Design a protein with these regions (language model features):
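A hydrophobic, multi-pass inner-membrane permease signature
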Residues: 2-290
Length: 290
């Protein structure tokens, strides 16, 4: 027992050279954490501290008044908050499930199937990762209009399904699967769908978890569809609703309401990442992305 304790102590004891690494990483960690702490602190600040001088980073008298004002503002709207929340939950679940399937099938085809133009398609997929959503908003609107999805609930789902980074991550994992395993499954009579479902999927779960998180963040926080593609209020999402409420506040009170709305939108992302943190780290270690 004593030997085990000594081994455990040696395992977690910092060596002197490691302190240099932690000193370099500490500023980066602080820069990443400070915005989160600021949102949390501002959401719980009373009105008198929001623009106090000198400003205080942390509140000394935390309160739930900003959240109360946020929900009071939601009661004055025509449609209830629950309707927007339902729209977001349905569209987010659909985007995550369908997007994972599309990304996995595309990654398998680009990795293990041999067809003309395969390398060109993957290069185009990689190139598309360079463009932000704003750069393609007009072409996306024109496509949505041509296929007749304007002012449709599907406009919340279909534009979110294309995820080049998801295909890229999954392809790196599928590339590592031995071709002999795939060939053995084909000899046993398995078709491509059975290979993807029964062989590939269990072996790329870390990458799938990472893709699920990215899809969730895009769908849950996305407001593009509600702003550009949808005119009917009953089809809009929770993110758009929270953004509208936070912008409706005036002056000091509006800052507190905005921080409370931002915190409510941010919490599901944090919870999901914490639950899948180990799989995300595994994905980054094996995908070539650092």
């Amino acid at each position: 027992m004593a030997k085990k304790l000594r081994k455990r102590e040696r395992k977690f004891r910092f060596k002197r050279p490691q302190w240099h690494i932690y000193l370099l990483l500490l500023p980066m960690v602080l820069l990443s954490v400070l915005p989160i702490l600021y949102i949390v602190s501002t959401a719980f600040k009373p009105t008198g501290e929001l623009f106090a001088y000198p400003p205080k980073f942390f509140t000394l008298r935390p309160t739930l008044d900003n959240f109360r004002k946020l929900f009071e503002a939601s009661e004055d709207t025509v449609f209830p908050l629950s309707m927007y929340l339902f729209n977001s939950i349905v569209s987010t679940v659909a985007v995550v499930l369908i997007g994972m399937i599309i990304s996995l099938v595309a990654a398998y085809a680009l990795s293990k199937k041999r067809f003309r133009g395969r390398k060109l398609i993957f290069k185009m997929n990689t190139l598309s990762m360079m463009f932000v959503a704003t750069a393609v908003s007009i072409p996306r609107y024109l496509i949505i209009k041509e296929v007749g999805l304007i002012d449709s609930f599907w406009a919340n789902i279909i534009p979110m399904l294309a995820m080049p980074v998801g295909v890229f991550l999954l392809k790196q994992f599928v590339d590592q699967l031995p071709d002999e395993v795939i060939e053995a499954a084909r000899i046993d009579g398995a078709n491509d769908y059975q290979i993807v479902w029964k062989i590939v999927t269990p072996l790329v779960k870390p990458a799938l978890a990472t893709v699920a998180i990215l899809l969730f963040q895009n769908a849950w926080n996305g407001m593009e569809a509600s702003k550009m593609f949808i005119n009917t209020e009953s089809l809009k999402t929770f993110a758009f609703y929270m953004n509208t409420l936070s912008n409706s506040g005036n002056g000091v009170a509006g800052v507190g309401i905005s921080a409370a709305a931002s915190l409510l939108m941010f919490l599901p992302n944090v919870v999901l990442f914490i639950l899948m943190q180990s799989k995300v780290m595994n994905t980054m270690a094996h995908s070539g992305m650092k």
